[in-house]
Amino acid sequence: CRHGVPVHTDGARLFNAAVALGLSCREMAAHTDSVTVCLSKGLSAPVGSVLMGPADFIARARTIRRMLGGTLRQAGVIAAAGLVALEHMVERLADDHARACRLHQGLRAIDPAWCAAELPQTNIVQVRVDTSAAEARLWQARLAQAGVLVRTGSAGLLRLVTHRHIDDAAVDSTLQAFARLQHPT
């Protein structure tokens, strides 16, 4: 808390960043007063986030949650999935990062202009197919027809994310789809 202003970390992708940097989440959030972590992004829990901070902050958050009707009954099954995510899924994030690097390298082999020279640090690969948002949406639609789901970002940018359900075969088929679209027969 600097100058009396508490600092909060939105840790939606904190585990990915920690694995990529070789740090613990504790080290990453050491200079903040509170942090949330998402258990579904990358960690494969069906739902859930965890809020951490000083005891008085957590007590106040619980009160506000109850006032807003956020109390969840019979949450043991969801909590169990969250525990599995925390205990068993963090280590495998490095596999997602490695597949993102492989995807990035394969895309650069097809068209070097598509991706920056630097490898991605985590599991997100950005591909600039054009400078036009309309062209990016066209690529998105054509890739979807080939079974590859991507998101469009800013003008001409596609965003690909690797995760537990993306294996080496999926990376290969994604690269094949991009190659077919880049060089149609």
Model-predicted segments: where are they?
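Conserved PLP-enzyme active-site core in the AAT-like
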Residues: 1-133, 137-146, 151-166, 174-185
